[in-house]
Amino acid sequence: ERYGVEIQETPGCAAERIAIKIGDQVHDLQDNQLTEFVDGFHQFFAESKAVWELPYNSHHTRDAIVECDALTVADRLNALQLTPLQRTAVGGMLEILSMNQPANASYVEMMRCWSLTGWNYELFNDTAARYKFTDGTGALVDAIVQDGGFEVALNTSVVSVQQTANGVSVTTTNGEVVNAKRAVVTVPLNVLNSVAFDPPLSSVKQEASALKHVGGGYKVFIEVDGDPGAVMTLSRSTDSPLIGSFTYKRGQKHSVLAGFSLEPGALEKPLSEWQTVLEEFLPGVRLLSTFGHDWGVDALSQGSWCTYRPGTFGRFVDELPRHEDHCFFASADTSEGWRGFIEGAIA
């Protein structure tokens, strides 16, 4: 609202049709199954209100959070008597949210995300995926730059940050040195160790960057012929290379779906193979192309969105955003609330 950046609804996140693969069979979710579908999430997250009563203030229930810290999503799923539909819906959705296998994903981190949206499935879906910037994230960046009068240097990597009594000296790969009284560090957690800090960062920050968060996988955009409608697909990674997808942009001649995959090399997968995969969910669909960016191999990210590993919250959550002399740490990867989201980066 501050900048008047236009937003629009993502069609598939208000889906008219949900195709869900349970085992080796694809079914269209029926109206009489919606209660069962949503109830699976309420069962999985039944403890979240007590554990994350105030999701923007983890100190409020820190003991309860730390008590669950070592648990994985797989641990929680195995403890519940969910129906096959619920197990696929919850498991698949959380594979997308964590961008990793349930055995590697943190139960605490998933509860945090659920609590941020008021323990409500509809708000969870709307907040996490339903709305997007009409002109992309770049429109927001441009508005912030114009408002603040900043100078932006693209394709300019930082190799070192040296602190002195008077401030900081930031050196880029091309040898340019920028001197300032303070530095706000928004480098993603997974590449923080690629910058040489003098004096060195705390041992905990170095440990966290070396360990890395669990966010991996691939976001694969799929261009299809015609208009498939406002559709969503859902599966488990053990049952399909496509754990989920939704209509991202509709058009009469061609449309685009946003898909998610944990399969290695998903972006290099031949179009013919993706055709077979998607047609299982949407019979008759014809793929035109696939595209996306490999954030895992990108030297400036080395991963997708951030969620901490099981058992690391208690060690990392207070230390990662703690300032060190003239360096202040304020990335989405260290945000107290919307960690891993653009809201966390802004906050």
Question: Residue locations for each model-derived region?
Answer:
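Conserved flavin/dinucleotide-binding core of flavoenzymes
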Residues: 31, 167, 233-347
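Active-site/ligand-binding neighborhood in enzyme catalytic cores
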Residues: 56-157, 165-167, 186-188, 196
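Flavin (primarily FAD) binding-site architecture
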Residues: 183-203
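Core beta-strand elements of the Rossmann-like FAD/NAD(P) dinucleotide-binding domain
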Residues: 173-182
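N-terminal glycine-rich phosphate/pyrophosphate-binding loop and immediately adjacent elements
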Residues: 1-53
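Central beta-strand plus flanking loop segment that forms part of the substrate or channel wall
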Residues: 204-230
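A short alpha-helix-loop-beta-strand transition element characteristic
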Residues: 2-19, 84-91, 229-235
